[in-house]
Amino acid sequence: MNRLLTAASGLALLMGGIGAVQAALSLPVAQPKAANLARMRAESLNGGLASYRAAACMYETGASSCLISKSEQGFLFGFLGGPPGWQQQSPPRPTLETRILVSQDGERILAVPYNGPIP
């Protein structure tokens, strides 16, 4: 009985994980790399992790929720940020907005059209 329960639990976990894997596989290969590069640039521009955290969407695989556009120019990400803990406040109180354009291959920052106070 325990073996059956263990096998059923493992299968359920595996099936749940398949959805996440399929979602990640549908992303262009360069998108997660581009998202990580954009997030790290924002962290660097805004004083490092000791004083800045990007929005949670930038920590998702590929940051699809923060992706403004994907074109021949590259990946344009737009997201909020602020001091550590800003998203846990009620309501959340971001202090900065950042837009970063990353090359199509996810290797280079092409532009930082905006990084500053929330307009």
Q: Residue locations for each model-derived region?
A:
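Residues embedded in well-ordered secondary-structure elements
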Residues: 12, 27, 66-68
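Bacterial N-terminal signal peptides that target proteins for export
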Residues: 1-8
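Bacterial N-terminal signal peptides
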Residues: 8-16
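A short, surface-exposed interaction/processing loop segment used at functional sites
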Residues: 93-119
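Central antiparallel beta-sheet cores of small beta-barrel/beta-sandwich binding domains
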Residues: 24-25, 43-45, 75, 79, ...
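Short, non-transmembrane alpha-helical segments in secretory-pathway proteins
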Residues: 24-61
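Exposed beta-strand-loop-beta-strand "reactive/processing" segments of non-cytosolic proteins
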Residues: 53-101
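Sec/Tat signal peptide C-region and signal peptidase I cleavage site
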Residues: 18-24
